[in-house]
């Protein structure tokens, strides 16, 4: 089975099989936390405007712009906040700067799209392995069009675990991600050095980084199940 890592989304990229979308700080971590809190479904929209179109008393709007909760949204993009949110049985509509856009890029061609992070790394890798017939691709959201150390490190953790689950043929991007993972024995160190973590510190949200650095603490894997309008519908596997 081929193992591929793309460090940022690209319009020219196509995915024939399974894609693990990674935005570890913070969207894919927060997505798993919402499912842990009992959310029925996650609607991932490509823009804040398309998210606001779903605004309703039975819907929770969550997201960020510049790291902060957007106007008229109910919640930000904090996994700590998500885990304690009153979302049981409810739909959570999410829009973020990088993660939701990466998911839309993957969904253009992939058979299966999963949201992965360190938080649900082992569960996400196992499910990807079960679903894949020819390739598992790990798509890093990056930060505003640039590669992110945090996502690349997470891709390395996923790639390593996929290798433990069975024989894989890593492409160059996967080899780079594995090298990054091996260079940082401590997940928190790797994430803390990233531009995404530094940006959170600037807006006083650095406490989210240790949460995002937890490895394999959740079995909740958001899987793409359909669409409504511009939104991708993710539910727990």
From Swiss-Prot:
GO terms for molecular function: 2-phosphosulfolactate phosphatase activity; magnesium ion binding; sulfopyruvate decarboxylase activity. It is an enzyme of class 3 (hydrolase). Its EC number is 3.1.3.71. It comes from Thermus thermophilus (strain ATCC 27634 / DSM 579 / HB8). This is Probable 2-phosphosulfolactate phosphatase. It catalyses: (2R)-O-phospho-3-sulfolactate + H2O = (2R)-3-sulfolactate + phosphate. Belongs to the ComB family. Pfam families: 2-ph_phosp. The keyword Ion transport does not apply. Its cofactor is Mg(2+). Coiled coil: none annotated. Keywords: Hydrolase, Magnesium. The keyword Magnesium applies.
